[in-house]
Swiss-Prot record:
HAMAP family: DnaJ (MF_01152). GO terms for biological process: chaperone cofactor-dependent protein refolding; DNA replication; protein refolding; response to heat. Signal peptide: none annotated. Its cofactor is Zn(2+). This is Chaperone protein DnaJ. Zn(2+) 1 binds at C151, C154, C204, C207. PANTHER family: CHAPERONE PROTEIN DNAJ (PTHR43096:SF48), DNAJ HOMOLOG 1, MITOCHONDRIAL-RELATED (PTHR43096). It is found in: Cytoplasm. GO terms for molecular function: ATP binding; heat shock protein binding; unfolded protein binding; zinc ion binding.
Length: 382
């Protein structure tokens, strides 16, 4: 049976760069890897062909020989100065995976494993709701969640009795087995110890040898002053318990601050909209304003204040997290136009508008309409 062209196998042109070869092989190897296709002989054979093609094309000398002589360059006794077949593909393909995939396939020691074989517990996430006042003052929030916790009967070892575990005779403690198939090696997770490298002789009846059981956890979370929505609180070791005494994961608590009826927040600064009467905006005066700390502050409104003007109260905002500083509070003025006026009130306003100095009293609107009039005259005269 003739062998497939290496370039065609990987879907490459003969001018492919090493980066393109690696990318193509990675894509195809992920699809046909034996760990992803257990028991599929066709996938296993395809994987062998892909690995052979990669081994040749990624090597400068082997690729040059292949480009010149084709598959015959690697035949026994080719007589063309080519490579011996058996020595030409001596690569351990687990090295290829470590290079291309970062050791992510099962069969190597995964990053989720600790050195002595136990699987580290997963990190957990929990969302809580707090008020803006809780964020200002700091608070403690009771939480509860269900996860794997360390088994109390065996203290997490998974074993009953003095002998905790013995080395797996199949993988000899490595957690994986290697099978030589022709010119390369396939590495798989040991099916006897499931990659742990150890076997428990007398399993704990409560946890069935896992060293952990499902249970409810109740904690009191300390929420620091100044925390914002999107921040996270990390509780070390409060996540899922590790397998057979391995390290537990962490718990991440994400606070969500409820919408406040008065304030909006931007970082450590607080903002609020305050409607004031037209007469107050015109003549100036004072208003009493509540702060997030529960105190009241007398705030001066300048004479001639306009709609949208902002008044700043220094250090009346939120605490800066892990600091003694505070943000500011900004009051945005909304000048309220009077409604439901009496006839007498309307006459007074008309009389005021007819006063000769109203141009100076309303410089923005007067100036605007003068510009409009000038613009219109320019159009008519053009």
């Amino acid at each position: 049976m003739s062998k497939s062209d290496y370039y065609d196998l990987l879907g490459l042109s003969k001018n492919a760069t090493p980066e393109e070869i690696k990318k193509a092989y990675r894509k195809m190897a992920l699809k046909y890897h034996p760990d992803k296709n257990p028991g599929d002989k066709a996938a296993e054979e395809k994987f062998k062909e892909l690995s052979e093609a990669y081994d040749v094309l990624i090597d400068k000398d082997k690729r040059a020989a292949y480009d010149r002589y084709g598959h015959s360059a690697f035949s026994d006794g080719s007589g063309r100065g080519g490579f011996d077949f058996n020595s030409g593909f001596s690569t351990d393909f687990s090295d290829i995976f470590n290079d291309l995939f970062g050791g992510g396939f099962r069969g190597g020691r995964s990053s989720s494993k600790r050195q002595d074989g136990g699987t580290v517990g997963s990190d957990l996430r929990l969302d809580i709701e707090i008020t803006l006042e809780d964020s200002f003052n700091g608070t403690k929030v009771p939480i509860n969640y269900v996860t794997h916790v360390k088994c109390s009967s065996c203290s997490g070892s998974g074993s009953e009795g003095s002998v905790k575990s013995v080395q797996c005779n199949t993988c000899h403690g490595a957690g994986n087995t290697r099978t030589q198939q022709g010119f390369f090696t396939i590495e798989r997770t040991c099916h006897v110890c499931n990659g742990e490298g150890e076997i428990i002789k007398n399993k704990c009846k409560k946890c069935s040898g896992s060293g952990r059981v499902r249970d409810e956890v109740n904690l009191l979370v300390t929420v620091p002053k100044g925390i914002e929505s999107g921040d996270k609180i990390r509780l070390n070791g409060k996540g899922e318990a590790g397998y057979r005494g391995a390290q537990s994961g962490d718990l991440y608590v994400y606070p969500n601050i409820k919408k406040h009826k008065f304030f909006t927040r931007n970082g450590a600064d607080l903002y609020c909209n305050v409607p004031i009467k037209m007469i107050l905006a015109t003549l100036g005066g004072h208003i009493e304003m509540p702060s997030i700390d529960g105190t009241w502050t007398k705030v001066k409104v300048p004479e001639g204040s306009q709609n949208g003007d902002k008044l700043r109260l220094k250090e009346k905002g939120m605490p800066v997290i892990n600091s003694s500083r505070r943000g500011d509070m900004y009051i945005q003025i909304t000048v309220e136009t009077p409604i439901n006026l009496t006839k007498q009130q309307k006459e007074l306003l008309k009389k005021f508008d007819e006063e000769p100095n109203t141009v100076e009293c309303n410089p923005q609107s007067t100036g605007f309409f003068q510009k409009v009039k000038s613009f219109w005259n320019d159009i008519r005269s053009s």
